[in-house]
UniProtKB/Swiss-Prot annotation:
UniProt xrefs under CDD domains: lipocalin_CpcS-CpeS
UniProt family annotation: Belongs to the CpcS/CpeS biliprotein lyase family.
EC number: 4.-.-.-
Signal sequence residues: none
Pfam families per UniProt: CpeS
Protein name: Chromophore lyase CpcS/CpeS 2
GO molecular function, one term: lyase activity
Keywords: Lyase
Length: 196
């Protein structure tokens, strides 16, 4: 699987449950969000625009995604919100389409346009590595089934304030009877850290 195929598999609406560990404070915070992923082909105006923004030849882009989210975290103050959108564009390396540049309209750790690296690992997980001016982030996304996606991230800020996050994301499906969104049944396999 390449990164564009991963985005195609991610298309749709998701409900995310998140736990963020604030390592400096030795505390964890929970939250949730609703996420929608819309695939964009290489000729989509949003892909052309983000390539232009980052001064990358648009003919090198394989496509990408438009992602929106709306969520909350337990420690939110009244004026805080976790709502937004961003465009991702995939620019694969010519010698290996499973790695390359990931153009973002808005970064994960800082709200600025940024170019990071992506790599598909041996388990078809999508790894994103991004260096910002004041911090760096590593994110990994992977599927355990077609309707269950996992995400982990580590953000290292200069000055030692680090966070680590783990999310489970369940695909939402439209109910045929009354156009309501429902969470599909997910068959889970349980594993022990001890091997039994």
């Amino acid at each position: 699987m390449n990164a564009m195929e991963f985005f195609q598999r991610s298309a749709g609406k998701w409900r995310s449950q998140r736990t963020t560990h604030h390592l400096a404070f030795r505390q964890a915070e929970i939250g949730h969000s609703d996420i929608e992923v819309i695939n964009l082909d290489a000729k989509d105006p949003k892909i052309l625009e983000i390539c232009k923004m980052h001064e990358i030849d648009p003919s090198l882009a394989a496509g990408g995604a438009f992602v929106t989210w709306d969520g909350s975290m337990a420690w939110d103050k009244d004026d805080e919100n976790h709502k937004g959108s961003t465009v991702f564009a995939i620019v694969p390396d010519s010698e290996n389409p499973r790695s390359g540049r990931m153009l973002r309209e808005r970064g994960y750790a800082e709200i600025i346009p940024v170019v990071g690296r992506f790599e598909m690992d041996d388990e078809d997980g999508l790894n994103l590595i991004t260096e910002y001016e004041t911090m760096s982030s590593i994110e990994r996304f992977w599927f355990t089934s077609p309707n269950l996606r996992m995400r982990s991230s580590a953000v290292k800020r200069f000055g030692g304030f680090n966070t680590s996050t783990f999310c489970t994301e369940v695909r939402l499906v439209e109910s045929n009877s009354d156009s309501q969104t429902e969470t599909p049944h997910v068959d889970l396999e349980y594993y022990s850290a001890f091997g039994w």
